[in-house]
Amino acid sequence: DLDEANDASEIEVNPVMITGDRDVVAADAVMNIDEDALFRQPDLAEMAEESYEDDLERKAGEYGFDYVRLSGNVGIIGNGAGLVMTTLDLVDHYGGSPANFLDIGGGAKAERVTQALDMVFSDPNVDSVVFNIFGGITRGDEVAKGINEALAEFDEIPKPVVVRLAGTNAAEGMEILNTDLIEVEETLEDAVQRAVRNAEEVTQ
């Protein structure tokens, strides 16, 4: 089997999309290899080294994030591939240009949220950031704590950040967020539109 032959701990096709012509397309596929078994997979180990296009993608791999660097200037962080894809599509819909796909995954703790923001802030192409979290496993108050911790690392916020929290403990998260440093929107549409405007203002 594919997983046993390659020492894979996970094989996933996600997301699957339906095109306007009703064709089904596997938009992304991921195979995670057990790092402790790479000595048995020299070809895969070499491919892993070659697959990193830059330091950000290498760092994302170390953090365990699903990350793809794009050519735009609006940084996108979310929890869940579908949610991030929706945010990416809305950025494009409202006239912006996505800078990345960054999925922090379910149940992300404050440390991982801090790592995600640090990554996006480190991208010189990013002019603004939209952070979209729908709480389930990932609690809104935990995410808010992580955002505040990340922001505390900077003497001044390097790029404008718009946050949208919904779902589990979202109200508590909204109260925790330092709104002196970031902007908060209740709906995803409003958050994306503000992030796109922020990016436009930076580039003017």
Positions of the model-derived regions?
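Short, acidic/small-residue loops that bind anionic groups at enzyme active sites
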Residues: 150-167, 185
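Glycine-rich, proline-tolerant flexible connector loops at the mouths of alpha/beta enzymes
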Residues: 134-138
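Short Gly/Thr/Asp-enriched flexible loops that form oxyanion-binding sites at enzyme active sites
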Residues: 139-150
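Short basic/hydrophobic patches in alpha-helices and adjacent helix-turn junctions
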Residues: 119-122, 149-153
